[in-house]
Amino acid sequence: MNIVVIGPFYPYRGGISDTNKELCESLINNGHKVEIINFKLLYPKVLFPGKTQFQKITEKKNLKSYRIVNTLNPFSWIRVVKKINGLKADLIITTYWTGLLSPCYYFINKFVSNKVIKIGIIHNVISHEKRLIEKQLLKLYLKGLDKYVTLSKNVSNQIEKIYKKTNGIKLFHPLPTKFGVKENKIKSKKLLGLNIKDEYILFFGLIRKYKGLEILINSMPKILEINPNIKLLIVGENYISMKKYYQLIDKLNISSSIIIKNKFIDNDKIKYWFSSSELVVIPYSKASQSGITALSFQFEVPTVSSNIDGLKELISDNESGYLFNRSANELALKINYALSADRKNIINNIIRIKKELTWEKFINQILKNI
């Protein structure tokens, strides 16, 4: 098939861009011709909460893309329509996670030839920023699609409450292979400058209010009572002020047991943080699905996750990870239990589940349902 994929790609950074790259590489590896249409302007600076939207390092194996789409400029949308019609595409795939994209995506899907199948991969129903009229913008986007694909049952359920048409395909979050595989633990600790005698639990990714970092920090004193040599790694760029977290750490007198790497981690270093850790902690208050869970499975590190929709779909308590009910006390109990347990069975189950979460299976499921 001739397939056009529209979304953020290099030089844009982050999980959506990384996922789009793996999507295209997998389609190409399965014999499809793929053209990539990238954003020239994605977020206006005033709406972007982070330090930069762009990668600081050059991708070694970069896919060619046409940087055309400007979310604020309808003339760029017309250029995209002309480009796609000229490519004689069989299928368009757009990737959606925020209502800001709805007008341009709807326009493109509406005015591209009716012979082209339009599919949307939906990461979030409502963006993390919870902007006004987001549900209406989602409906607009969905009206332009022949089929939509979700990465979790949770997202499918949310869409069905808003939009009654039954043209959805519920799939899964494919595991990200581009970041490599699990590395030797001692080697990883040395490379990151960590003490090889200590054990580490990891909080990884963008720091936002809903991600529950405060609960994790509050759980640390009880964790340290049982596991005095454990260290908490807080690794990721903040999208909110870090002041309250530093104040809480000082108040609890646990600064010697916490290491904060407050920056966006380059792709080639991600595997070392996961490979250094005994557990990955995901104490979110809400989740569509979690790219961090997918990373943890890729690197075969057990997770301790909130028992909420979007996370518990992939995690079975004491089988493929650990679940807790979002209190600092219960989180401490669960982490202490996990640290004392023989986690070989958990890891073996993760390895088994990994085989079902491949890009090839993801793509095959989409194409057989269109």
Q: What residues fall within each predicted segment?
A:
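Nucleotide-activated donor-binding/catalytic signature segment of Leloir-type glycosyltransferases, i.e.
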Residues: 243-271
